[in-house]
Design a protein with these regions (language model features):
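Solvent-exposed alpha-helices and their adjacent loops that cap or buttress functional pockets
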Residues: 1, 14-16, 68, 90-92, ...
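ATP-binding N-terminal substructure of ATP-dependent carboxylate-amine bond-forming enzymes
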Residues: 1-73
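Short acidic-hydrophobic, aromatic-tinged amphipathic segments that line or gate anion-handling sites
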Residues: 21-27, 99-103, 134
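Short beta->alpha connector loops
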Residues: 27, 49-51, 101-104, 165
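Conserved ATP-binding module of the ATP-grasp superfamily
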Residues: 43, 86, 94-97, 117-120, ...
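Short, well-ordered alpha-helical microsegments
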Residues: 52-54, 107, 168-169
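A conserved helix-loop-beta module that forms one wall/lid of the active-site cleft
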Residues: 68-130
Length: 172
C-alpha cells in the first residue's frame, strides 16, 4: 500500500519537511481519535512514552484504529523502572541487585549498607533524566532529596541499585 499523506502529532521543524504537523495535545485521546477518524488515517505509530504509558494504544484500538505501539501494561516496562525490575526478578532475568523505597528516610537508611558507586532512579517517566550514578553517601542523599522533592514529577517510589560497570546500550 502507498502512503499518500503523513501526519505528525505535534511534530517539529524536522517533521514539517516530510509531514503535516498537527497541533494536538497528546494527553487528549478523544481529540486525537476524532482527528484520526476525520482524516481516515490507516495506521498510527506512537513514539512518545507518555501517551503509551497512559494507554493510547488501548484507547484507539477500542475504536478499531490500527496502532503500532505497546499497550498500557506493556508500556509500563518503560514507564516504571520498578515494574521492570519486578518482571526481571519474577522471570529470573539477570539484573542489578536493587531496593525499592517509598520515602526519603528508608532510602537514606539503606545507604549505610551500600557499596558505592550506586545508581538511584526515579520510578516515573523523567525524559531520560531521572537516573543518578552516585559515588558516595552525600551525592546519594542529594539525589534522593531531588527525586522525592519533585524534580521529575510526583515520584512516589525510588529504585536504588548496584552499579554495573560496562557500556550502556538501548535497543528499540
Amino acid at each position: 500500500k502507498k502512503v499518500n499523506k503523513l501526519y505528525c502529532f505535534p511534530g517539529n521543524a524536522g517533521t514539517a519537511k516530510i509531514a503535516k504537523n498537527v497541533d494536538i495535545d497528546l494527553d487528549n485521546f478523544k481529540k486525537i481519535k476524532n482527528f484520526i477518524l476525520k482524516e481516515k488515517i490507516d495506521l498510527i505509530v506512537v513514539g512518545p512514552e507518555k501517551p503509551l504509558v497512559n494507554g493510547i494504544t488501548d484507547y484507539l484500538e477500542k475504536f478499531k484504529i490500527k496502532v503500532f505501539g505497546p499497550n498500557k501494561l506493556a508500556s509500563q516496562l518503560e514507564g516504571s523502572k520498578i515494574f521492570t525490575k519486578k518482571i526481571c526478578k519474577n522471570f529470573n532475568i539477570p539484573t542489578a541487585k536493587f531496593g525499592i523505597f517509598t520515602n526519603e528516610r528508608k532510602a537514606q537508611n539503606f545507604l549505610d549498607k551500600s557499596n558505592f558507586p550506586i545508581v538511584i532512579k526515579a520510578d516515573n517517566l523523567a525524559s531520560g533524566k531521572g537516573v543518578y550514578i552516585c559515588e558516595n553517601k552525600k551525592t546519594s542523599i542529594e539525589a534522593i532529596k531531588e527525586i522525592f522533592g519533585g524534580k521529575f514529577g510526583n515520584a512516589k517510589n525510588i529504585l536504588i541499585e548496584e552499579f554495573l560497570k560496562g557500556e550502556e546500550m538501548s535497543f528499540f
